Regions:
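Hydrophobic anchor at the beta1->P-loop junction of P-loop NTPases
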Residues: 8
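P-loop (Walker A) phosphate-binding loop of NTP-binding proteins
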Residues: 11
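ATP-binding Walker
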Residues: 14
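Walker A/P-loop
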Residues: 17
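Post-Walker A helix-loop "phosphate-sensing" segment adjacent to the P-loop in P-loop NTPases
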Residues: 25-33
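ATP-dependent small-molecule kinase phosphotransfer cores
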Residues: 37-92, 96-99
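Conserved phosphate-donor/acceptor-positioning beta-strand/loop module used by diverse small-molecule
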Residues: 93-97, 107-129
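NTP-dependent small-molecule kinase module
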Residues: 126-135, 152-185
Length: 185
């Protein structure tokens, strides 16, 4: 039993979720991995679509009962992939944090392709400020600083895609569609 997983990884505001949405729209045969998290939903996020939002107690219960494939702490919140989230018979795609990637790498039954989504600091900050009507600037700064440390070195990246501009994003989607097609044969 093996799971094929494309993992998108990148700093806050890099556009990981947008890229994943576009890839799933273009390739409906993909299994979109919806992670669990203990953080609160951001404006516009929907439970079961963007994440499964759970309490710390609920998350701990999922881990203890073996219902989590991987679990990690990132930027003061817990994130994880439920056992039922990955499908053996599909190409799985999801957004993961560095600790989640490291956990997935420990599993011998996971064929993992890690794609780093890159955008400039300026564009990432602008995107985060524009994401919500009343952004929490302190939280944006905290995440920015934490990301600098957490993403300093990622030795487990297979590809890096430029998501800095609309044109770059369109080219990244085109290239990622080629990666998906290669997987699917």
């Amino acid at each position: 039993m093996a799971y094929n997983v494309i993992a998108l990884i990148g700093e806050a505001g890099s556009g990981k979720d947008t890229l994943m949405r576009k890839l799933v729209e273009a390739n409906p045969q993909l299994n979109e991995v919806v992670s669990y998290t203990t953080r609160s939903p951001r404006e516009g996020e929907v439970d079961g679509v963007n994440y499964h939002f759970v309490t710390g107690e609920e998350f701990g219960e999922l881990v203890v009962t073996g219902k989590m494939f991987e679990a990690s702490c990132f930027n003061d919140w817990f994130y994880g992939t439920g056992v039922d989230s990955l499908k053996e018979d599909k190409l799985n795609i999801g957004v993961f944090n560095p600790e989640g990637i490291e956990s997935l790498l420990q599993h011998k039954n996971v064929n993992l392709t890690v794609i780093r989504v890159w955008a400039s600091d300026k564009n990432r900050l602008i995107r985060q400020l524009n994401r919500e009507e009343f952004p929490d600037v302190d939280e944006i700064i905290r995440r920015y600083k934490a990301d600098r440390e957490d993403f300093e070195s990622l030795p487990f990246t297979h590809y890096v895609v430029d998501n800095n501009t609309l044109e770059a994003m369109e080219e990244s989607i085109r290239l990622l569609n080629l990666v998906v097609k290669e997987y699917l044969g």
